[in-house]
């Protein structure tokens, strides 16, 4: 294994607004996505905002899945982070996008834990 984990950041647009605003549906979708990927679910926490929107997290033994939904824009911000090489986060990310009826899907995968990031000296800020 070259990395400690894989992190998929998914931008989902033109989603079904009713699904994005249904906390119970989104929670079930995320738990099912984790299970479809072969992950072990540990904790689940979701919150419904007024007048609309859902945020939530599914903690898995291998890391986490998160969402912030904006039904009024048909948009969802989704993260799927898995540690190790046993679980493929893309399986969960695609399952979620399908479940939200996302017509536009932009996924970026970032390898995690590959060592210190080299930052040019001019951009480093020291916080006291």
From Swiss-Prot:
Pyruvic acid (Ser): residues bearing it: 63
EC number: 4.1.1.50
List of catalytic residues: 63, 68, 83
Post-translational modification: Is synthesized initially as an inactive proenzyme. Formation of the active enzyme involves a self-maturation process in which the active site pyruvoyl group is generated from an internal serine residue via an autocatalytic post-translational modification. Two non-identical subunits are generated from the proenzyme in this reaction, and the pyruvate is formed at the N-terminus of the alpha chain, which is derived from the carboxyl end of the proenzyme.
Co-factor remark: Binds 1 pyruvoyl group covalently per subunit.
Pathway membership: Amine and polyamine biosynthesis; S-adenosylmethioninamine biosynthesis; S-adenosylmethioninamine from S-adenosyl-L-methionine: step 1/1
Pfam families: AdoMet_dc
Reactions accelerated catalytically: S-adenosyl-L-methionine + H(+) = S-adenosyl 3-(methylsulfanyl)propylamine + CO2
One MF term in the entry's GO annotations: adenosylmethionine decarboxylase activity
CC per GO annotation: cytosol
Origin superkingdom: Bacteria
Cofactor(s) this protein requires: pyruvate
GO terms of biological process kind: spermidine biosynthetic process
Keywords: Autocatalytic cleavage, Decarboxylase, Lyase, Polyamine biosynthesis, Pyruvate, S-adenosyl-L-methionine, Schiff base, Spermidine biosynthesis, Zymogen
Residue numbers marked as site, Cleavage (non-hydrolytic): 62-63
Annotated S-S bridges: none
Family: Belongs to the prokaryotic AdoMetDC family. Type 1 subfamily.
HAMAP family with a match to the protein in the record: AdoMetDC_1 (MF_00464)
Protein task: Catalyzes the decarboxylation of S-adenosylmethionine to S-adenosylmethioninamine (dcAdoMet), the propylamine donor required for the synthesis of the polyamines spermine and spermidine from the diamine putrescine.
Subunit structure: Heterotetramer of two alpha and two beta chains arranged as a dimer of alpha/beta heterodimers.
Name the record gives this protein: S-adenosylmethionine decarboxylase proenzyme
Species this chain originates from: Exiguobacterium sibiricum (strain DSM 17290 / CCUG 55495 / CIP 109462 / JCM 13490 / 255-15)
Record lineage: Bacteria, Bacillati, Bacillota, Bacilli, Bacillales
Recorded name of the encoding gene: speH
